[in-house]
UniProtKB/Swiss-Prot annotation:
It comes from the Eukaryota. This is Pyruvate dehydrogenase protein X component, mitochondrial. The modification Phosphoserine is found at residue 15. GO terms for cellular component: mitochondrial matrix. Keywords: Acetylation, Lipoyl, Mitochondrion, Phosphoprotein. GO terms for molecular function: acyltransferase activity. Required for anchoring dihydrolipoamide dehydrogenase (E3) to the dihydrolipoamide transacetylase (E2) core of the pyruvate dehydrogenase complexes of eukaryotes. This specific binding is essential for a functional PDH complex. The modification N6-acetyllysine is found at residue 13. It comes from Mesocricetus auratus (Golden hamster). Residues 1-27 are annotated as: Disordered. InterPro entries: E3-bd_dom_sf, PSBD.
Amino acid sequence: FRLSPAARNILEKHSLDASQGTATGPR
């Protein structure tokens, strides 16, 4: 998906955070 580097970095951080609890992610 297309997002600015900053937004993508935040989303990735949230994705990693969510991965610890659930196996679902925006990727």
